[in-house]
């Protein structure tokens, strides 16, 4: 019964709400409502017993609602502007090694320097004596504070490392002593115009003089007194006996009139090369046709292609030739003499006609 009454009241209120046009109607009607009517406006689940509430929950499950409070964009912008900027930590000051000139941290430089000095001693002992350098001394810390003292100490350490460099003789570039030897293998001198390396210390000058004297020069050569070719001082004693044997074999193959006496080894003189060049020139034989000088074995090869003949043998052939050949030569001369006046006769005859003189035969 009670449920029916409540439903009727709620239906009447809904109908009057839809048909009423005044907003104050609900307020007036709310005053006449009893406590039971207030409970009827609430959901049914709230007015039901606990046992009945469980049954209704199993039948209808309504999802729960969550309210999210979204902050305004202006607030986020203002908060980001008010936050201070993040400043990165200051980079530690690097220190320059006074031996190799590289940079290290303030804590690792103390570990590096003893190892670098030990390596320097090992590499310095492997170098030639004229390229060895004195042990580099650590520059004293300068008085100052902050970044100025660090910069000054790094500059002094860098100058100490640069003092270990040696200039190249060819190009003038500076290298460490161990790197200089590697560079000199591929560095080619540019000529006399290459700039000379400048060095302030006397150690550089003495080292450069020793380095120049220590560069490998061309080995001295000696001329063979038989063939006239150049050989080294060590290979010449091996060459001379073989060259003399070869000379004897070639000399025996020549005609008898071209045989040469056995060459003699010259005595050593201060001018060794000039004294040895003389006997080798004495072994040369002149060609009878062109008067060029050759060695005895090369003369035969030259005579095969030499076609020029001297004038002396031709005159002898004319004088010692047969009578027929002499007659032929005289006849040819007479024919030439006859042919010559015929040309002159024509010239004289033409001149006489031009002058108006009577033509006639020219008597010779």
Swiss-Prot record:
Region (Disordered): 43-64, 127-148, 187-215, 259-280, 305-345
Binding site for Zn(2+) 1: 97, 100, 112, 116
Signal peptide boundaries: none
Keywords of this entry: Metal-binding, Repeat, Zinc, Zinc-finger
Entry binding sites for Zn(2+) 4: 287, 290, 302, 306
Cofactor requirements of the protein: Zn(2+)
Pfam families given in the database record: zf-C2HC_2
Polar residues compositional bias, start-end: 306-334
Record bears the keyword Nucleotide-binding: no
Disulfide cysteine pairs (residue numbers): none
Molecular function GO labels: zinc ion binding
Binding site for Zn(2+) 2: 168, 171, 183, 187
Binding site for Zn(2+) 3: 224, 227, 239, 243
Bias type Low complexity, positions: 138-148
InterPro entries found in the cross-reference section: ZC2HC1A/B-like, Znf_C2HC_C3H
Gene3D superfamilies: Classic Zinc Finger
Residue ranges covered by zinc fingers (C2HC/C3H-type): 93-122, 164-193, 220-249, 283-312
PANTHER family in the record: C2H2 ZINC FINGER CGI-62-RELATED, ZINC FINGER PROTEIN 474
Protein name: Zinc finger protein 474
Organism expressing this protein natively: Macaca fascicularis
